[in-house]
Amino acid sequence: MVVYLVGAGPGDPELITLKAVNVLKKADVVLYDKPANEEILKYAEGAKLIYVGKQAGHHYKSQNEINTLLVEEAKENDLVVRLKGGDPFVFGRGGEEILALVEEGIDFELVPGVTSAIGVPTTIGLPVTHRGVATSFTVVTGHEDPTKCKKQVGWDFKADTIVILMGIGNLAENTAEIMKHKDPETPVCVIENGTMEGQRIITGTLENIAGKDIKPPALVVLEMLSMFLKK
């Protein structure tokens, strides 16, 4: 028995890796999230498909339930795929699932995916680094675990470009915190449904972006913008 944690990429089914496709074709069982484009499941023909539905604020199953289910399916099948949107280790809680497998002595392999933090800005021609302008970037969650005793995100980032994932529900709160450290006129770009049908680009500033009509899934990019979005 072996479990593959597979990254499905940022949304466009053509952005999944060849290795991910090959693993899906051999799968006995696939546990998949909502962020993983369901069109990708066509590669798992004949496999048992289990929807575990993890979205911010709308969890069909809790993380503990997913861990338990993953272990149970692994013990009953030769090859189980845990399909996750983006990359399993970029705010995908893949590490928690690996620890659950290790505790039960279950073998696993990892298949990286294209993270939306880079893939989505690239799709619209917005680089997160650029020679002479941006030599660093930070990827941060905009939705910390509400059960934490203390928040870890301080928002005083020194990177030239900041990419915020899962941040639309807390956009007003997050931008207010960022404005304690950055100019309110700092340019902001939000990309809805990145790489997928219905992709939409919304631009503004730290001061006004939260007032725009924005719906998840979407990511937020700060600063590395002006010279590219005008083209």
Swiss-Prot record:
S-adenosyl-L-homocysteine binds at P10, G85, G86, D87, T115, S116, M166, A218. It is an enzyme of class 2 (transferase). Pathway: Cofactor biosynthesis; adenosylcobalamin biosynthesis; precorrin-2 from uroporphyrinogen III: step 1/1. It comes from the Archaea. Does not show substrate inhibition at uroporphyrinogen III concentrations of up to 20 uM, in contrast to SUMT from Sinorhizobium (previously believed to be P.denitrificans). One of its GO terms (molecular function) is uroporphyrin-III C-methyltransferase activity. The keyword Hydrolase does not apply. Its EC number is 2.1.1.107. InterPro entries: 4pyrrol_Mease, 4pyrrol_Methylase_sf, 4pyrrole_Mease_sub1, 4pyrrole_Mease_sub2, CobA/CysG_C, Siro_Cobalamin_biosynth, Uropor_MeTrfase_CS. Belongs to the precorrin methyltransferase family. Homodimer. This is Uroporphyrinogen-III C-methyltransferase. It comes from Methanobacterium ivanovii.
